[in-house]
């Protein structure tokens, strides 16, 4: 007979199953709905695996001593349910909970924890003697194939194996089993933390097929989505994508995930309509989120249909998919009926598949397709979210713009800047006119009021200034510079990086952009003590050029401001960010560079177009 305790739990979950449930339930097991079983060292890691699994909504983790059979310890059972709920039963040692797919908080794939006296089993393919577990984890992070490791400490029973570091991998990226073993420490690679020193190759190579081992294949609308899938696949190191124009129809939109023993492609074959590239899992500072935000016009995604709803516009269709815990992708058909345009609704088809990708992609049927944005909120270190000097600006509050820093020289505010990595600040080159050495510079993070800064305020010293070698004046372009800090900063709610723009989102339409800084609020005003903010619209380069006929507005610049004036950056805001929110993630779209006056009518502010310098930024931050 079902206990009252179980019935109450069932009613509770029935009311919140489509919402965020963060609580875990000890000595409770979900019954049925099994998708697969993996092994994880903790319930927290089990939830992480569930969250990033394409279909997992619930999980049950079998803790140590949960069974008389030790081979069942540390089992992580991934589950799904059409109703998003499952019945629960009492089970000693079981820990159950929900995926974080529907939760607003950030959940990183990064796991820095190490597990004492646990041996995570896998394919042992490399062994070496190292000083400690930290060095072993670093070796794993800097090895292309390594997913996790086990280190034998100085207390390991076998003297011959002490200080031994074993690098491991499996097909799934999780251990095949986990056992208790005294004197060892196990943990995971920190590649997903953005801490690998391996080469990061961001180029996508057209007309190229990589002829190496295919470990998996999925259907994708373009090479950028294919690359993101490869990046978050446990064993993919590089890929080949066949475009819509590929001659063999059955292979169009096919994304081939690949690996090799050496970690690099062995053979490149030139073929039209194929594109190839590399996983970005190795990229230091900025492993991309598993998120596909774009819309694909005249494109139908095929898959298992979950629901059909009438909505107004593809954005609403995408939001409906995102709010449905099981929806992975969608196709929206606009209405062509003769009716009031303002009330016209189209049909939104919510869909899913076993691997989270369409089973097939078709064109020419009038659909607009895209993906759920539910994983766009996952934390890749820089996916900072906030709630919403600036001439016409308003005062900011602590934690609202955590990437904004103030650069000081001679105990006074010089310029603004943006945190893009734990040792890197991006700012404007013109800020350093006449400054020969970085030794006098101070960088303050987490500051809202300049009056807060005194001799006891913590700051970062600058190790190196890197100014673009083509910079001459702000008006001529290339107004961009990097500061490398002497020591790495710790990220907090008040001091975090902002994401760089993605090449894959180069056609993104930014409708929510803000400028921030401590500059003058009028041309002859006073420097502001409190960080100012103002929302500004972007202005096309063509229109901006008509406002500045004496200057050349290039594609390496971007303009923003109101036609009537009133809100703009001003002297003292230089180097600060033009931050734009796109699909819930803030991106550094511009760097405050130059303009005429402050908030003058028909004189928009001119900013360095960061998207045009991403390759330069990555080159400098990864080689210095």
Swiss-Prot record:
It is found in: Secreted. Disulfide bonds join 20-103, 46-76, 50-56, 110-193, 136-165, 140-146, 200-283, 226-255, 230-236, 291-376, 317-348, 321-327, 382-499, 415-431, 513-580, 544-559, 570-598. Keywords: Blood coagulation, Disulfide bond, Glycoprotein, Hemostasis, Heparin-binding, Hydrolase, Protease, Repeat, Secreted, Serine protease, Signal, Zymogen. This is Coagulation factor XI. It catalyses: Selective cleavage of Arg-|-Ala and Arg-|-Val bonds in factor IX to form factor IXa. Gene3D superfamilies: Hepatocyte Growth Factor, Trypsin-like serine proteases. Residues 1-18 form the signal peptide. Inhibited by SERPINA5. GO terms for biological process: blood coagulation; plasminogen activation; positive regulation of fibrinolysis; regulation of blood coagulation. Residues 390-622 form the Peptidase S1 domain. It comes from Mus musculus (Mouse). Belongs to the peptidase S1 family. Plasma kallikrein subfamily. Its EC number is 3.4.21.27. The active site is at residues 430, 479, 574. The gene is F11.
